[in-house]
Amino acid sequence: MKKLLLAIVFSIASILLNAVEQKLLSEKEPETLTNVRILGKTNKSPLSYLPGEEIVFTFTLDTGKDKPGDWRFHFRHGGDGLKIQNGKAPVNKPLIVKTSLTKPGFAFCEVTLHDASGKRIYSETVRPNRKKLKREIIFSAGAAVQPEKLKDCGEPADFDTFWDQQKKRLAAVPFMGKVEKKLVREYKNGYVYAISIPSAGPRPATGYLTIPKNAKAKSLPIHVSFFGYGITKQVPPPVISSRLINFQVNAHGQKLEQNEEYYKDFFKSIGGKGYAYNQKHNKDPETCFFNGMALRNLRALEYVKTLPEWNGKDLIVKGQSQGGLQTMWVTALDPAVTEAHPSIIWCCDLAGSLKQKRFGAFGRVKYTPALEYYDPVFMAKRIRKAKIVITRAGLGDYTSPPSGLAICYNNLATPEKTIKWYQGSNHTIIPPEAEIITWTAGKKVEK
């Protein structure tokens, strides 16, 4: 009898343990793979379609050395003037999605990999610093109908007058003899300084300046870089170049070399993660967050041009996303800039979604007429001499939509201009061996 009871107890315990194990398995983290990727392509060069022509996206799964699982494609597609459509498909055969546009614009199809329960599957890579990076398995494809014909929605009549007034505001705040310059690092080949420069607006222009050791007067080019959107403490660069002066400009005018409590309070004071999204402030071009940022950027350039080591010729600016936005501002507003390298430029064609039914950006600052004074598509018209290389425009990037970048490129007045379109790229991910289409000097070059 005792043996029978023990057998029953063990049997029940086994059933319960198995149930718990199955529950835990069902709640486990999504699969993480190292070799699996989604491949995507179009039936012709993605920027060469005509109105009404069928656009065909084809996607396949490459599992590499990983064993295929019980997976599904999840996809959504849409575009300028199109409604979003969603779907699911098996991964054991090509996924084909067809669409078309009746006028110049962009279409997209985004495909992600999911398990049978609907959870996304991720890839894992190891960075050079040995830290693991986890990313979703995704392909963000895009295609366009006559993108070279896309136009902006019209600029404010007093655009130039407004910026003349802002430059006068900046000039009314002198900075010569008032710059705070503190040595914070010394490397074998140079120095790093924390810089604070008086500026118009609520805060000074700040950033880290690097100057090589033994630099002679009028001997070096200057590189100025701008940062993407975020609220993080800026830290000194870990390395410096012996061949140039570099100024990394802070987007917010934060004090440098402060304790964590300062940065916590500072970011709260400027609006936290939504610092540029305040609708009340964005009703007026002089009260929006971008105003102080732009003035700090211009003041930063004014300062570096006073450095005795500058060769007086080469002033190169760069940045991506919000940094690309700032890069466009200073290149348009300071004729001393000789070369600019913006990437995935943020806030292009802010009015396009409302006025032209172009597919709007995810997480973009909501359009107001006041923000038109900061739109890169209008700044582009004022860039007449500097060499411009838009180093990346993602055909599937709807944080910085491709329609806006196409208009930005089309509007550039300079004869030296280039844009590189990346197939499958969204705002953060570039597929390995991505198809790149390069336009240069107004001509399309297929690669």
Predicted regions and their residues:
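Cap/lid segment of the alpha/beta-hydrolase catalytic domain
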Residues: 232-295, 349-358
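Gly/Ser-rich "nucleophile elbow"/oxyanion-hole loop immediately N-terminal to the catalytic nucleophile
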Residues: 214, 275-320
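Short beta-strand element of the alpha/beta-hydrolase
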Residues: 207-211, 218-229
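C-terminal catalytic histidine-bearing segment of alpha/beta-hydrolase fold enzymes
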Residues: 403-447
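N-terminal cap/lid segment of alpha/beta-hydrolase-fold proteins
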Residues: 41-47, 170-216
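Short beta-strand elements
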Residues: 118-154
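Hydrolase active-site cap/lid region
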Residues: 261-262, 320, 324-369, 421, ...
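The feature captures the conserved acid-bearing segment of alpha/beta-hydrolase catalytic domains
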Residues: 353-412, 418
